[in-house]
Regions:
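Structured cytosolic domains appended to multi-pass membrane proteins
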Residues: 1-167
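Peripheral docking tails and interdomain loops at the edges
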Residues: 149-210
């Protein structure tokens, strides 16, 4: 993505990156609102790939997915990662799974203990581009330590092929990998209806994971 490359080269100033994130987040909110306003018939007639995914109701969700916000989507590193996280969370909510978005700062050793993971069944780390898996590897370890009961999904939205993604999934240590919003949403909706087991309280953060 051009914006991601500009950010890496330092062309995008901090205020511009923040404005971009806010704009994208606002757009995602508008998309969610328009979807809610649309009639059931209109949704059934649409031919987009997202519309081919099921729209779940609460009764269809597995017990561990019936909390207020069973899905956590968190930006991996940059403002663009967070903006992508906001759009993806809005998409999944359109299909009946409540989601919460957090910023990348919550993945740091200093902040991970303050990340509320109660009721979370799946954590999705959103990354527009990942030159090295080291950063997300440590983030995954911290998330695993806090919520060992929850599944972990890596959304690497710029991956060119599934083979690369599968390799990164193994290196990073996530349960699932997706390189498109549609793939990731399909994984989440499938887990949301089939996951078994009781909800558990998140563990306390360990200093060893700093």
């Amino acid at each position: 993505m051009l914006a991601q490359k500009d950010a890496e080269r330092g062309i995008l100033e901090d205020d511009k990156k923040i404005h971009m994130r806010e704009t994208v987040e606002s757009l995602s909110a508008d998309i969610a609102h328009e979807h809610w306003l649309a009639s059931k018939e209109a949704r059934e007639l649409t031919t987009t790939s997202a519309a081919k995914l099921p729209i779940l109701n609460t009764e269809q969700l597995a017990p561990t997915w019936r909390s207020a916000e069973p899905l956590l989507v968190i930006g991996a590193r940059t403002e663009l990662d967070q903006a992508a996280a906001a759009i993806f969370a809005a998409l999944v909510e359109m299909h009946g799974v409540p989601a919460r978005v957090e910023c990348a700062e919550m993945l740091t050793a200093c902040n991970i203990a303050n990340l509320d993971l109660s009721g979370v069944a799946l954590m999705c780390v959103s990354s527009v581009d990942m030159k090295t898996p080291a950063h997300i590897h440590f983030a995954a370890r911290r998330l695993r330590s806090r919520a060992p009961h929850a599944k972990l999904l890596l959304g690497l939205w710029s991956a060119k092929d599934d083979e690369t993604g599968a390799e990164l999934k193994d290196v990073v240590g996530t349960d699932d990998f997706a390189r498109t919003f549609h793939q990731a949403a399909a994984i989440i909706l499938q887990r949301a209806t089939t996951d078994q087991g009781g909800a558990k309280a998140p563990a306390r953060a360990s200093a060893a994971l700093a």
